[in-house]
Structures are given as structure tokens and as C-alpha cells.
Regions:
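Conserved SAM-binding loop
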Residues: 5, 12, 104-107, 168-169, ...
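Asp-based, Mg2+/Mn2+-dependent phosphohydrolase catalytic module
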Residues: 1-2, 111-223
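Surface-exposed, interaction-prone regions with an acidic/low-complexity signature
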Residues: 8-11, 104, 133-140
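Hydrophobic, well-ordered secondary-structure segments
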Residues: 26, 72-76, 80, 105, ...
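N-terminal helical cap/lid subdomain that shapes the substrate entry/recognition surface
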Residues: 2-92, 99-100, 113-116
Length: 223
């Protein structure tokens, strides 16, 4: 494999603290009690939809969903660069990929309005995640975000590679679905935002890894 593509939240970067902070600000605004971090962590990878379902039991087909979604995004915009950190072992993994000459990029469902500044806020050596990644594709860069393969295929076009040369690493079922639909090998990051009810062994990925370092061991398995 010559290219590794990563999901962002819960795969490369721990953003759960700021996602949860915005949700708790919204809950407080609506007279509800804030939620503890351990309740928020497992759904942090599911974006605004998952967070609103957790906090308010509001779903996309509810009449108030869109207003709640926009309110949440405005609150998140005020806090989203406060606490982002690499998940343990990720900085070392990216350095190892660089040393091996393996190109890597980011494909996320996070809107571009957040993704660019977030990746710029996460330092990697003497630069930052945004500068070091070979590409950054966001959920609103294509008509359909993951689990559709559109943004993954756009990443291939930007990096001038074929999908079969790529591994896509993520922590959600939609990541596996998108990668497989694009014709890529897929790896589940078990260290990410998985809930107890998730069953990653049933998602059809080519490999599951407990730590970022294990990805290096699995590169040959995905050839």
C-alpha cells in the first residue's frame, strides 16, 4: 500500500472534550443537566446527529432537528479548538509513515469550516496536522459524505493514486462502508470512539487494530 487515509475525530485526534463541551452548553441553555464525559465519548464520532440524539433525543426527521443542529454548530464553533489532542500513539505513527515514505491524508465527515482550523491547531513536530497531511477532504466537499465513497475517491484524485493502493482507517461502521465502496482496504481503529453496542468484528474490515502502532504491522496484511 502506498497511501493511508484516516478519519479525523476518534481516529487521529481526540475531539470529544470540545464536542461534549458544546453539547453541555446547549443542554444548559435548554434547562437540562450536562452529561459526563463517559456518556459523550462513545458517540463523539457520530457528529451532530449522534450528539443531539444523546442529549435531546432529537432525530433528523423531527421538526426541531435543523434548528437544534445549527444551534449546536454555533456553540461548537466557539470552543472547537480549545482541547484537540492526538490520540495516544498517533504522532509516532505519522512520523513512522513519513520515515517510510508512505503518503497519508485525512477524509472526514466534519464540515470544512471546522476541519481546517482544527487540524491547524494540532501540532506535529515543527508544523501541524493540516500542513503535514497530503490531503484534507471534508464532509461538505462532496454531495454525499461517508458512508458514500465520494470524498475518498476525491482524495485519490488529489493524491494521484488508485483506490486499490489505499488503506482507509476509521472508528465507525460508515468508514468501513465508505472504504469498501471506494475499493480500498479498510482498518478499524478500536482505540477510537466505539460504544459497547458496536460490533466492529461484523463490519467487514480487512483488519482491526487496538493501537496506532499496530497499523504498521497490518500494512502487509492489506496488500
Amino acid at each position: 500500500m502506498s497511501v493511508v487515509l484516516f478519519d479525523l475525530d476518534g481516529t487521529l485526534v481526540d475531539t470529544a472534550q470540545d464536542l461534549g463541551l458544546a453539547l453541555n452548553m446547549q443542554l444548559t441553555r435548554h434547562g437540562k443537566s450536562p452529561l459526563p464525559h463517559e456518556r459523550i465519548w462513545p458517540v463523539a464520532s457520530h457528529g451532530t446527529r449522534g450528539l443531539l440524539e444523546l442529549g435531546f433525543a432529537v432525530y433528523p426527521d423531527d421538526s426541531q432537528f435543523e434548528a437544534m443542529r445549527l444551534e449546536y454548530l454555533d456553540l461548537y464553533e466557539s470552543v472547537y479548538t480549545q482541547h484537540p489532542l492526538f490520540l495516544p500513539g498517533i504522532a509516532a505513527l505519522l512520523a513512522a509513515l513519513d520515515s517510510k515514505g508512505i503518503k497519508w491524508g485525512i477524509v472526514t465527515n466534519k464540515p470544512r469550516r471546522f476541519s481546517v482550523n482544527l487540524t491547524k491547531a494540532v501540532k506535529l513536530g515543527d508544523s501541524n496536522l493540516f500542513e503535514r497531511a497530503a490531503c484534507l477532504l471534508c464532509g461538505d466537499d462532496a454531495p454525499q459524505p461517508k458512508p458514500a465513497p465520494d470524498t475518498l475517491l476525491m482524495a485519490c484524485a488529489q493524491m494521484q493514486c488508485q483506490a486499490e493502493q489505499c488503506i482507509y482507517v476509521g472508528d465507525a461502521q460508515r468508514d468501513v462502508q465508505a472504504g469498501r465502496a471506494a475499493g480500498m482496504k479498510t482498518v478499524v481503529a478500536l482505540f477510537g470512539y466505539l460504544a459497547e453496542t458496536d460490533r466492529p468484528h461484523e463490519w467487514g474490515a480487512d483488519a482491526l487494530i487496538q493501537t496506532p502502532a499496530a497499523l504498521l504491522e497490518n500494512l502487509s496484511c492489506c496488500d
